[in-house]
A protein has these predicted regions:
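Extracellular/periplasmic solute-recognition and catalytic clefts
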Residues: 1-50, 69, 73-74
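Short helix-initiation/N-cap motifs at beta->coil->alpha
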Residues: 1-6, 19-22, 147-148, 170-180
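Short, hydrophobic alpha-helical packing/hinge segments within bilobed ligand-binding/sensory domains
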Residues: 4-5, 23-24, 58, 71, ...
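Periplasmic binding protein-like
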Residues: 15, 142, 159-188
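Extracytoplasmic
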Residues: 39-41, 82, 137
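Immediate post-signal peptide segment of exported/extracytoplasmic ligand-binding proteins
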Residues: 56, 119-141
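Structural transition elements
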Residues: 81-128, 146-151
Length: 188
């Protein structure tokens, strides 16, 4: 949070978990800045119980409109890498080595080239689903919170999906409401 960042800058705190996104460039190369591999995977969750997310081609189109390398390298300023499996770097296997080095014979579970941003293919998939240029699709709502990279990623999704004709409304929700909302399926 910005409050924690300010406290760190003033010397009140010795360490903070995250630097505000806009401050990362000023921290790179500093002795007191270190990026630790995150044990987790950043992903977009779609509610498959709601239309149009129950249509495979719509989900594929939304996926192909996302440039994962851009998200990881630019929006997240190199603090993430585009995922090749649901378990990202940092997970340790039983022998102490990195999980990804052993899992699936050391090969990625996913061929990321299949998931490379492809706006034309995404548009075709939407058309195949009955939504040429996004026509007929209702406005979609993406719920997120405003911590860390979430807001920046949500704004990117809004822009990326607009390129294929999808109108996305970004809804910022407090963590205290966000988690129960997700558990109850009250999201798109």
């Amino acid at each position: 949070s910005n409050a924690a960042y300010s406290a760190y800058q003033s010397g009140e705190l010795l360490m903070i978990k995250a630097v505000p996104t806009e401050e990362i460039p000023s921290f790179e190369g500093r002795e007191d800045y270190y990026v630790e591999p995150i044990i987790g995977t950043y992903y977009v969750s779609l509610n498959l119980n709601k239309e149009p997310f129950n249509i495979k081609e719509v989900r594929q189109a939304l996926s192909l409109a996302i440039d994962r390398d851009y998200v990881a390298g630019t929006l997240m300023q190199g603090t993430y890498t585009a995922a090749t499996s649901f378990m990202g770097p940092g997970w340790v296997d039983t022998d102490g080595s990195e999980f990804q080095a052993n899992a699936n014979g050391g090969k990625p579970y996913m061929d990321n080239s299949y998931f490379e941003a492809n706006v034309e293919k995404a548009k075709q998939l939407l058309a195949d689903a009955g939504y040429p240029n996004g026509e007929g699709l209702p406005q979609l709502t993406y719920s997120t919170n405003d911590t860390g990279y979430h807001k920046v990623v949500a704004e990117y999704l809004q822009q990326a999906w607009a390129e294929i004709g999808v109108d996305l409304k970004v809804e910022t929700v407090e963590w205290a409401s966000f988690t129960p909302m997700r558990r109850n399926g009250d999201y798109e």
